[in-house]
Amino acid sequence: MSEKIAILSAYSFVNIEEPESLIPKLLFVGKRKYVKGTILLSKEGFNGSFSGSYESVNLVLEELKKLTNTKDVNVKINYSEIHPFQKLKVRLKKEIVAMNVDNLNVNLFKGEYIETKDWDEFITKQDVIVVDTRNDYEVEVGTFKAAINPYTETFKQFPAWAEQNAELLKGKKIAMFCTGGIRCEKSTSLLKSMGHEEVYHLKGGILQYLEDTQNKNNLWQGECFVFDDRRAVADDLAPAEGYWLERK
């Protein structure tokens, strides 16, 4: 039986003085180890999702940690029968997840994590508002029961939604979620900076939730959209039927 492909997602909000200098080093290590995927670099940190053998993706992760001088990295690994990415790309960006809000200090303002095992109980409380921070096309594929859909086309539209719905959110316990956790880091930071006090988010995102709980209470409805050739995964994190992007 052939070895399954490991898919590693990792992000960290860490100051990188010259992110462009990391590009050739990461490309060299990644290509030498036959790793495929995308790594985004900016002065605010890094965000990557890449696939290969378990050993190879972890070598790239260790290189990222070394080059950015950080151990504080959010990491998620799952597995696939084949590579969900077609090649390795390392790109320089203004933000590792684009929200277009200047001077937002994610490490200073951050929501409180809710562990996956506690999420179902928390979001069914009467005084909790649940907000899906993802885009509308992702929400259409699947979301949590009773979650608010901001109907955004891009994450850059989320701040405007937050401003327009400030009264709706005022004084409430706000539970937010996204695919792997990174958008929640920024969206909870935004709401905290706006003065909302009780702001929470699902630790590890939907993917970690499905892995840990198998959706045992059926509060997750549908499939989870992902940004690779699988397009969507089911409760068991296997590619959802009918979504796989055929290679040309």
From Swiss-Prot:
Pfam families: Rhodanese, UPF0176_N. One of its GO terms (biological process) is tRNA modification. PROSITE patterns: RHODANESE_3 (PS50206). Keywords: Oxidoreductase, tRNA processing. SMART domains: RHOD. It comes from the Bacteria. The active site is at C178. The keyword Iron-sulfur does not apply. Residues 124-218 form the Rhodanese domain. It is an enzyme of class 1 (oxidoreductase). GO terms for molecular function: oxidoreductase activity, acting on paired donors, with incorporation or reduction of molecular oxygen. The keyword Oxidoreductase applies. It catalyses: uridine(34) in tRNA + AH2 + O2 = 5-hydroxyuridine(34) in tRNA + A + H2O. Catalyzes oxygen-dependent 5-hydroxyuridine (ho5U) modification at position 34 in tRNAs. NCBIfam families: PRK01415.1 (NF002397). PANTHER family: RHODANESE-LIKE DOMAIN-CONTAINING PROTEIN 7-RELATED (PTHR43268:SF3), THIOSULFATE SULFURTRANSFERASE/RHODANESE-LIKE DOMAIN-CONTAINING PROTEIN 2 (PTHR43268). Belongs to the TrhO family. This is tRNA uridine(34) hydroxylase. It comes from Rickettsia bellii (strain OSU 85-389). The lineage of its organism: Bacteria, Pseudomonadati, Pseudomonadota, Alphaproteobacteria, Rickettsiales.
